[in-house]
Amino acid sequence: MSNFIFGRYLPLDSVVHRLDPRAKLMLSFCYIIVVFLANNIWSYAILIAFTVGAILSSKISLGFFLKGIRPLLWLIVFTVVLQLLFSPAGGHTYFHWAFINVTQDGLINAGYIFVRFLLIIMMSTLLTLSTQPLDIATGLASLMKPLRWVKVPVDTLAMMLSIALRFVPTLMDEATKIMNAQRARGVDFGEGGLFKQAKSLIPLMVPLFMSAFNRAEDLSTAMEARGYQDSEHRSQYRILTWQRRDTVTWLLFLLGFVAILIFRHW
């Protein structure tokens, strides 16, 4: 649980940290779309270069991103193996037995899927590590302003997102404390097969859910005591302003996007 870093903010002074949260949110969303548009090694080389440049600009250690990948590593490996073993025939066949078919195209596609997972996870991790949860909520509310014309509760949704992001690392820390307490009582969460390991997590889930409900109730009581009204319009302590660095970042991304489109049909 200590390796789970999604939702954590790492306060540093870097170009990425100073970017407008709206720019980072839109860029992250478009980045994921572009990742699925890439279909050759040159396209992925551009995406990798952009991602590495963003990580270096953020001044965040690579170890944090590896921690972000570790909890999802089993899902990545499982998906890659499925693609590798059960891909349709195409290119040179390296191994064939019954319905298992390892081909050249399957190997290439498995590699692409592996890189896609890594790029998306690393960019999502960079977004949360370099942006405070409140800034993410504020940026999202600003981007969703047009939805107010169709009576969508934008401020409420932004508040819910902010609270959810803020509580993710808190609940992970709580889960770590509960697991350590149960290990001290002799519980081994890594013993046995997959089913037995999943069953051993049941004593963890009950106190974790109780803790989550108690924290949610305490938070709602504190908000009501401070006069929070969901329907009231409120000003922002920090006004978002689009800076030159946001424009430059987007121009670099658009330049890479155009290059990927060119390589896609090359």
Curated annotation (Swiss-Prot):
Annotated compartments: Cell membrane
Major place of residence: membrane
Gene Ontology MF terms: transmembrane transporter activity
Transmembrane regions: 32-52, 71-91, 107-127, 152-172, 246-266
Membrane topology: Multi-pass membrane protein
Keywords (A to Z) from UniProt: Cell membrane, Membrane, Transmembrane, Transmembrane helix, Transport
GO cellular component, one term: plasma membrane
Pfam families on file: CbiQ (PF02361)
Functional description taken from the UniProt entry: Transmembrane (T) component of an energy-coupling factor (ECF) ABC-transporter complex. Unlike classic ABC transporters this ECF transporter provides the energy necessary to transport a number of different substrates.
Subunit structure: Forms a stable energy-coupling factor (ECF) transporter complex composed of 2 membrane-embedded substrate-binding proteins (S component), 2 ATP-binding proteins (A component) and 2 transmembrane proteins (T component). May be able to interact with more than 1 S component at a time.
Family: Belongs to the energy-coupling factor EcfT family.
Name of this chain's protein: Energy-coupling factor transporter transmembrane protein EcfT
